[in-house]
Amino acid sequence: MTKTRCMHVHFRKILQRVKKTLRLSASDQQSQGVTEPLSLGDLPEECISLIISFTSPRDACVFALVSKTFESAVQSDIVWEKFIPPEYESLLSRSQHFSSKKELFFALCDESVLINVSKKDLWIEKATGKRCMMLSASALNLSTHHTWKWITNPVSAWLETVPELLTTRWFEIRCRTNTRFLSPRTRYSVYIVFLKADICYGFAYVAMEAVVRMVGHELSESCRRYVCFHEAMEWQFLTRKNLVNPERREDGWMEIEIGEFFNEGAFRNNDEIEMSVSETTQRNTKRGLIIQGIEIRPTKKPGNEMP
């Protein structure tokens, strides 16, 4: 099957979804004189734009490859306005001009144009249009502040200073944040982003308890798991099969997925999510962890959206 034919089939499926959403029943179609299934040639460009707006930014870019008509339809503000947070104007840190909603969308995806709100950096995931958030280290509740020192950021320029752990036995990081800036009806994964200093020890065989939960929602899901900040050697994976291990990021940092949650709400809701990573039982000496912050991104698994 050719790429164009595949896109046509995909388009027809989307059209069926739109009809269902608009509750356009078969009898409604018949009363309007529609006796045959709609074909692509029957649709005006504005209608094509509207239908594409029900997909995702990734799909929209693929649709643009189908034909000149589709390419033109994808450029419409009708498409990209659906992918932009409705409250974006109140989140922009400074006045900026964009020639189109598409240009605005890709600007909000650019990490160099982060939106800063109360120690939170917000941006849009390019493929899905979902909102992401980074809580900087200054927004975190670090156990016993005198056991941390603030140093020049060794990797990123947008955060000038980050905390480095001094010698301690009691390790605990906690934070809370409102979920109203995140995309509604979306499952999110939570990551702690970190580095290890030149002198770093006390984390190799230590399991940290990580908890992610909705505040005040006792009946809602609570995610609890054990993580390790030390990269496992190949021979260690069997003995650490129940631990979540760190992964290296493209930006030079490392991250550990500490939990997941489902964000039901929308902008202006009052739901809060609480996240913590702690180890207070073994009491072994620890040193040298550098924390960038906690990042919240859409989960890269089936079930990202509720039906």
UniProtKB/Swiss-Prot annotation:
SUPFAM superfamilies: F-box domain. InterPro entries: F-box-like_dom_sf, F-box_dom, PP2-like. PROSITE patterns: FBOX. SMART domains: FBOX. Residues 37-83 form the F-box domain. One of its GO terms (molecular function) is carbohydrate binding. This is F-box protein PP2-B7.
